Regions:
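Short hydrophobic/aromatic beta-strand or adjacent loop that forms the aromatic wall/cage
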Residues: 58-59, 190-195
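Conserved GNAT acetyl-CoA-binding A-motif
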Residues: 123-124, 151-164
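Conserved acetyl-CoA-binding loop-helix of GNAT-fold acetyltransferases
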Residues: 131, 137-150
């Protein structure tokens, strides 16, 4: 599986960037890689109306409506994003990160909503969403997140997302998401929480 953004979700990303310590890579380069992960994802999903930002740039989200992807398979976009990311990484970084990402595959899937939805069912999937740390507590996340939920409710659509921390699980729970499955593997001390919000 290609290097891809989902592997850099909170929790998973920490484990992967720790792996870069083996190469003596410092904080600045780790930050550069993390930004490249997000940028590569945005670059391939933006043509499908998946990238959104608040007018004041306090927050941004990568969210797709299944029907807007048309005939494109989500895994194709992941592969394309991974290819773009690989162009930024050195061979040594790929050698260190690649095996870890492969090993984490069972707890970093972004195609699980397709396993739960009917073949012709439209839905909203949150790939990533974040707020400028300096804007936390300002209501920026609610301003970013709520319009997607309102759209889903108006159109009778389920929303899907996954996260890796109890704090985020609780946050999304306040917006009506329920954890439907937890995934973990012995090799890494993290747990993926698969969450669904039904239309209201």
């Amino acid at each position: 599986r290609s290097l891809m953004k989902n592997a850099f979700n909170l929790g998973v990303g920490e484990i992967l960037t720790e792996a870069l310590d083996e190469l003596g890579i410092g904080r600045d380069r780790k930050l550069e890689i993390t930004r490249a992960v997000i940028r590569s994802d945005y670059e391939v999903t933006a043509p499908y109306q998946c990238v959104y930002a608040l007018p004041d740039r306090a927050g941004a989200a990568n969210v797709y409506l299944r029907s807007e992807l048309g005939d494109v398979d989500w895994t194709e976009l992941e592969e394309e994003s991974g290819t773009l990311l690989a162009e930024v990484l050195t061979d040594e970084e790929i050698d260190v990160l690649g095996p870890r990402i492969e090993a984490m595959d069972p707890i970093s899937s972004t195609s699980w909503p397709l396993e739960r939805a009917a073949a012709d069912e439209d839905f909203v999937y949150f790939i990533s969403a974040g707020v400028d740390p300096e804007k936390r507590g300002s209501g920026a996340f609610r301003r970013l997140f709520t319009p997607f939920l309102e759209y889903a409710d108006e159109h009778g659509l389920a929303c899907y997302l996954d996260c890796y921390t109890e704090r985020l699980e609780q946050l999304y729970g306040h917006f009506g998401f329920e954890t439907v499955e937890r995934r973990s593997i012995d090799a890494f001390p993290i747990e993926e929480r698969l969450m669904v919000r039904r239309a209201r």
